[in-house]
Amino acid sequence: MHQVIQLKILDSRIGDTIPLPAYATDGSAGLDLRVCISEPMQVAPQQAVLLPTGIAIYIADPKLAAVILPRSGLGHKNGIVLGNLVGLIDSDYQGELKISCWNRSQEHFTVNPGDRIAQLVFIPVVQASFEVVNEFTESSRGEGGFGSSGRY
């Protein structure tokens, strides 16, 4: 599936010294988001910072949204994860994409201009309506949760 999304460049370095968001491989689900800062920045242990990307997107289609997700290598190797775990970008949002970066490690982490720090994935959206009921139609699971379907 291919969808054209409007992208606004908010910082002139984007597309020049800092590449536009791009898929790293043909099979990548997420576009790499890069940090748009002027100089290297230290993120202290347990510190959370909001990092600019220098871009804004407008999805427009209410059947689509985007999520900002962490890059697996940064979390596993460096303890760098998203402070909000997942960033949800609604179809009508038009502001700058920012990355909430949390250093959960015990070491300082340096973020350099143009570093790939997160990824952007587009997802389908179902806008649901509710039917208020007194009882649910019975299912095999019922109210079982938190491990009720098996240990692993």
UniProtKB/Swiss-Prot annotation:
Q: Which Pfam families match?
A: dUTPase (PF00692)
Q: Which GO terms describe its biological process?
A: dUMP biosynthetic process; dUTP catabolic process
Carries keyword Metal-binding? yes
SUPFAM superfamilies on file: dUTPase-like
Alphabetical list of InterPro entries matching this protein: dUTPase, dUTPase-like, dUTPase-like_sf, dUTPase_trimeric
* Associated pathway: Pyrimidine metabolism; dUMP biosynthesis; dUMP from dCTP (dUTP route): step 2/2
Keywords linked to the UniProt accession = Hydrolase, Magnesium, Metal-binding, Nucleotide metabolism
Catalytic reaction equation(s) = dUTP + H2O = dUMP + diphosphate + H(+)
What GO molecular function annotations does the UniProt record carry, in alphabetical order?
A: dUTP diphosphatase activity; magnesium ion binding
| Annotated function | This enzyme is involved in nucleotide metabolism: it produces dUMP, the immediate precursor of thymidine nucleotides and it decreases the intracellular concentration of dUTP so that uracil cannot be incorporated into DNA.
PANTHER family, per the entry: DEOXYURIDINE 5'-TRIPHOSPHATE NUCLEOTIDOHYDROLASE
UniProt similarity note: Belongs to the dUTPase family.
Name of this protein: Deoxyuridine 5'-triphosphate nucleotidohydrolase
Q: Which gene is this protein's source?
A: dut
